[in-house]
C-alpha cells in the first residue's frame, strides 16, 4: 500500500488518477453486506484467510511452502465493486439485499496461479467449512478513474458518491 499512496491514501476531494493493472483474490456475491453471518461475512473470511496464508508463508517450517520471489508486504485494504445487477445503473442503499458485489484484496506480483492454488488448499485444510472454490484470481486493469475518500458511516456514502459523479462528468 505504501508503494501506491495515491490509490490507498486518497484525498477527501475528488481526483483523477491512473490505476495500474493489479492482481487480486476476489469473491463474488449478492446480498446485504451487513447481514450477520451472511454471505458477505463468509467472503471476508475467505479473502483475508487466503491473503494471510500467502503473507505468512514465510514462517512455514515446510520448505515446499516457501514462495519463490516472496517479499514481505502489508496486506492491502479490502476493495469492492458494487452494483444492483446487470443493466442497472448505480447502487440503491435502501435495497442492500439486492447488492451484487465483488470483494477483493490485492495480491503481490509474485502470486502465480500455482501459488494461489496452494494458498487456497492450505486455507481449506485449516478451514474445511469454507468454500474456497468461491475465491478466484482477478487481474484488474481499471486505467483512468475518479476517486475520493469517503469519511463517515457507510449509509452516508451516497452523498460522497454524488460529489464524485459530478466531478467525473
Annotate each PLM feature.
Residues 114-163:
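A mid-sequence, solvent-exposed acidic-amphipathic segment
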Residues 30-36, 107-111, 144, 151-156:
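A generic structural motif
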Residues 7:
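Basic, Lys/Arg-rich alpha-helical nucleic-acid-recognition elements, primarily the DNA-binding modules
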Amino acid at each position: 500500500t505504501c508503494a501506491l499512496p495515491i490509490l490507498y491514501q486518497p484525498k477527501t476531494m475528488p481526483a483523477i488518477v491512473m490505476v495500474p493493472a493489479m492482481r487480486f483474490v476476489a469473491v463474488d456475491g449478492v446480498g446485504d453486506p451487513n447481514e450477520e453471518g451472511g454471505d458477505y461475512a463468509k467472503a471476508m473470511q475467505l479473502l483475508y484467510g487466503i491473503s494471510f496464508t500467502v503473507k505468512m508463508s514465510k514462517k512455514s517450517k515446510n520448505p515446499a511452502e516457501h514462495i519463490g520471489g516472496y517479499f514481505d508486504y502489508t496486506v492491502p485494504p479490502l476493495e469492492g465493486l458494487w452494483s444492483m445487477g446487470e443493466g442497472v445503473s448505480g447502487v440503491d442503499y435502501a435495497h442492500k439485499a439486492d447488492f451484487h458485489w465483488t470483494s477483493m484484496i490485492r495480491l503481490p506480483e509474485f502470486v502465480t496461479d500455482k501459488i494461489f492454488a496452494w494458498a487456497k488448499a492450505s486455507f481449506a485444510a485449516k478451514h474445511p467449512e469454507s468454500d474456497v472454490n468461491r475465491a478466484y484470481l482477478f487481474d484488474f486493469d481499471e486505467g483512468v478513474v475518479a476517486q475520493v475518500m469517503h469519511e463517515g458511516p457507510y449509509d452516508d456514502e451516497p452523498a460522497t458518491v454524488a460529489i464524485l459523479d459530478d466531478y467525473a462528468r
